[in-house]
């Protein structure tokens, strides 16, 4: 009789894990708490022999499972986790399941901000010489790739996914930065840090650990890691004379970098280090960096119109991410669209950045009142409140700034389906003008 595996949720990663598990001969059960499911997907899985339930997590489905594969969105304090733990059923992430079933080396990218851009950039640089697709938290389940023939899997790993690994070992692991986010989910800042730290420490330590030299928490953490290479640092990889250097060799001048802002120079440094570690030459690395385009919704240049440049940074769902975008603009008249569903994060540092770099703030969404109060408390008063994204854009254009920047520092769910939807609404309206 074949081994029973339980898959939690009909997410993209859950569906991919179910298909892969069937191909490996497992008896696959999928349990989805939501009532509404995609009937086509359900039928496709059922035709493969997968048993599916939705609307509840029944005892019949849970009992007898050898292990469970979770979807990233299910919090560890959930009822289903409690029930599985009581039965001593091990819960792993889809990333772990993929790792256990392939010999293809993983390049793991994690961090609070910058990990998606870095993941996409690393894959793009390596594609000159290797087959190295993106996967993980970026929207491509690794189990959908491991039957194919690749040199590397460039995997964006969230704190949720990292926490649910035990044996996962990357060839190279990169930690872009660490700032408070997802604290509710993990139940505290230290838990959030430790979740990410797992994939850098024994028994899961990578061959090489790439860490941010400018992040004090990561600099301290580096003492616990092996084979550390720092970025944004004078010795390993950093900026000198307006160029990025690696081990004393000039790789690319800042003016040739397609991405703006110091945070993006850091992302490029991560890409350079990884490319050098897998044996690429400087001219190929430089050529690939120059041809790279930023992923959507991450300080994405939308258009120039009547002397105004529009940037969509809808992925900035916390103040730290918005600070990074705000600090990218110097000596320009910038109109910033802020707001959305408030995460109740500390706004002090962001207010300081706004004071330095922003001319006008346009507020939308549920966070408006708290953001206005904090901005005024920190000495910024050029604030305009609008009801919709379209109204905010129209008002911003009427001010004739150099830049209109959408970088909300908030979740999107008060007015939009997702940060992607918010970014699309911004772009569509700007492009319709």
What does each model-identified segment do?
Residues 409-433:
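Glycine/aspartate-rich loop-and-adjacent alpha/beta segment that forms the canonical ThDP
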Residues 28-32, 133-134, 154, 230, ...:
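Short beta-strand "acidic-cap" motif of Rossmann-like dinucleotide-binding folds
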Residues 3-4, 22-23, 59-65, 72-213, ...:
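Phosphate-binding loop of NTP-binding sites
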Residues 42-43, 348-403:
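C-terminal helical cap/extension that packs against the catalytic core
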Residues 4, 14-24, 132, 254-359:
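Nucleotide phosphate-binding/pyrophosphate-handling subdomain across enzymes
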Residues 35-41, 60-61, 74-77, 215-220, ...:
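Short, charged/polar "capping" segments at the starts of alpha-helices
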Residues 27-34, 209-213, 335-338, 357-366:
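Short internal beta-strands
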Residues 2-108, 290, 298-300, 390-397, ...:
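Short, basic phosphate-binding NTP loop
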